[in-house]
Amino acid sequence: MAPTKTIKNKHAANKSGIKGSKDAERSRNDGVLKSKGKPKGKAHTLVTASKGRPNIQELIARKKKKKTYSEKELAIPELNMITPVGVTKPKGKKKGKVFVDDKESMATILAIVQAEKEGQIESKMIKARQMEEIREARRAEAEKKEAERKARLEETKDSLRKKRKRSKQSGGSKGDDDDDSRDVKEFSSAGTKAVKSKKKKSVSFAAPE
């Protein structure tokens, strides 16, 4: 048998001059693996083509990943609306009176409204009382004037009666009696006319609500 050579260093095969041996090929390819495939130029063109036109799946994924902003982040200005305290429009519902289950706030609102209404009623009551007092004062004044008129009429009647007695005692004629009766009638008629004219001038007020 021929003697075999032992190679301690794996790179010694190249130095020894053995080019076609399997050990030399293994030493060259040791640590580096080359891919046996298509050339670089074609692969580069395929990558650029895929980047230029994205697939449908990529578009769907992008749409799904879109960020959603809240109303506070967008800072949308709120419109001027009349909403009671503690009432907010719930998101996703129609506009309307959707009240929150807050009994305290509702009680405060009712108390404010009731106080305003009571104030209006009180003012109406005060006005009605004032008008009633004015009417009573006018009635008292009219009664006083009527009493004064009657007193004057009685005085004139008494004076005329005294005159009649004197005329009878002195033996006066009937003409004097007729004149006295006319004077009494004229005075009484004048008194009633004066009262009627005053009543016409009186102002009537509308009844309070």
Swiss-Prot record:
Assigned GO CC terms: nucleolus; preribosome, large subunit precursor
GO molecular function ontology, one term from the record: mRNA binding
GO biological process, one term: mRNA transport
Keyword Transport assigned: yes
Locations listed in the record: Nucleus, Nucleolus
Disordered: annotated span: 1-53, 135-209
Keyword terms, alphabetized: Coiled coil, mRNA transport, Nucleus, Ribosome biogenesis, Transport
Keyword Transferase: no
InterPro entries recorded: Loc1
Biased composition (Basic and acidic residues): 20-33, 135-159
Predominant localisation class: nucleus
Coiled-coil regions listed in the entry: 126-170
Protein family (similarity comment): Belongs to the LOC1 family.
The protein's assembly and partners: Component of the 66S pre-ribosomal particle.
Function as written in the Swiss-Prot or TrEMBL entry: Required for efficient assembly and nuclear export of the 60S ribosomal subunit.
Record's protein name: 60S ribosomal subunit assembly/export protein loc-1
Gene: loc-1
